[in-house]
Amino acid sequence: AGSSLNGGSMKITYIHHSAFLAETEHACLLFDYFKGSLPKLPEGKRLYIFASHRHPDHFSKVIFDIAAEHGDTVLLLSSDIWRKRVPEELKGAAVFLKPDTVWEDDVLKAETFRSTDEGVAFWCTVDGHTLYHAGDLNHWYWDGEDSQWNENMTRNYRKEIGKMEGRHADAAFLPLDPRLGEYFYLGIDDFMKAADADWIFPMHFWGEFDVGARLKALDCSRGYRERVVEISRQGQEFSI
C-alpha cells in the first residue's frame, strides 16, 4: 500500500537511485531508470521514458526493452546519449533533447535545463500536474575540491536554477547526495529559494535513506521541511 501525501490523483513510485515512476490520468513518466523492480505499467497510457544523461547510474539500454514491451512510448533522451544506442525499431519514438529545449505532444510538455554535470534536467507538465526531475543538475560543492572550481559550480548552479524563478512543481525530484558531506543540502536549498514544490523527493542518495531526515533537521530547511518526503525503501509508492 502506498503513502497518501495529500490524496491526489498522481502516483509516484521510488524505484532506485534517481529513478521514479509517475502515473497520471493519461500517462506514465519513467525517469532515469537503469535497474530495480518496475511496477506493472497500465495499458492504455502513454509511457514517457526520460534519460537525463548517459552515466550508467541514470541510463541503461534496458529502457528500450521496456519501451518495446509497452508499445505506446516516447523516449526523451539527453543529446549526450549516442543515437546509435537506440534500436532501429525504436528510432521513431526517440527524441534527443539539448538543454534549453521545449518538446511537447498532445499529452505532455517537457522543458530541459543544462546540468552542472552531464546532460539535462526535465520540467514536465502533464494532465494538469508539474514535475521537475533534476537528473544530475545539482550544486556539486565538494569538500577538498579547488576553491575556484567550487565557486564556478555555485555560480553555474544558481544561474540555472534562476531560470526556474517563481515556478511551482507538484513534485520535485532533487539530488541529496551524502558524499558531499556538510554541503549535501545546497542543491535543494537553492532550488527552494528560487522555485517552489509541494513535495520534494530526495534522490541520488546511494542507499542512505536517512538523508531526508538529515535535511529536515537542518535550520535552513525550516521553511520547507514538511514537504521533504522521507523515502524508506525501493518500490515505495506515494499519492499526491
Question: Whereabouts are the PLM-identified features?
Answer:
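Active-site environment of divalent metal-dependent phosphoester hydrolases
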Residues: 36-39, 54-59, 81-85, 118-120, ...
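A short, acidic, amphipathic alpha-helical segment used as a generic capping/interface helix at domain edges
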Residues: 157-162, 181-190
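Active-site metal-binding motif and surrounding structural segment of the metallo-beta-lactamase
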Residues: 35-84, 162-173
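Short active-site oxyanion
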Residues: 10, 71-75, 199
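Core dinuclear metal-dependent hydrolase active-site scaffold
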Residues: 5-44, 93-168, 233-240
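Binuclear metal-ion centers of metallo-dependent hydrolases, dominated by the metallo-beta-lactamase
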Residues: 13-17, 87-103, 185-240
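Structural motif
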Residues: 30-31, 50, 76, 131-134, ...
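Short amphipathic alpha-helical segments
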Residues: 42-44, 61-64, 88-89, 145-146, ...
